[in-house]
Amino acid sequence: MKKRGFGVGKWNGFGGKVDDEHGEKVIDAAIREIGEETESENGQIGVILLPGDLNKVAEIDFRFEQKPEWSQKVHVFLAYNWQGQPNESEEMRPQWYDISEIPYEDMWVDDEYWLPRVLSGEKITALFEFNENQELLGYKIDSSDFPQIKLK
């Protein structure tokens, strides 16, 4: 559960911004963000990932025409190997769910359109358009040229 910032009160994956100013790569930002967001408030180390642990499964453009500063391109990764466990942090309260019990009603409305596809092994590119009230106006999802992943 997102505890602060954009999307507060919604179940969401770990993530954040790429430090373009210092030449950070997307995969390095993903590794850094999950480390930061799974470290407990008292400094207990959470999840540790290596670049080979991540499989890129989606690139999604989120557009907010009336609030362009909210628009963002999101790179989605799945990990099947990691060290440590996620801890509650100032930003996130993690929770594991069976795929059949994912609480889409408590997530961003777009998640129910793309997340089942990537969890089934498909890799996608997508565009979601929202209004200033965060209501979905339209979307497009395409299978990508990324190679298909093999779920364990």
Each model region followed by its residue ranges:
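N-terminal strand-loop-strand
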Residues: 1-13, 55
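Short acidic/polar capping segments at secondary-structure boundaries
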Residues: 4, 102, 131-135
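Short, electropositive, low-hydrophobicity segments enriched in small/polar residues
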Residues: 9, 13, 17-20, 125
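Unchanged
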Residues: 18-52, 60-118, 138-152
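A general secondary-structure junction signal
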Residues: 58-60, 132
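Short, active-site-adjacent segments that bind or coordinate small-molecule cofactors and metal centers
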Residues: 118-140
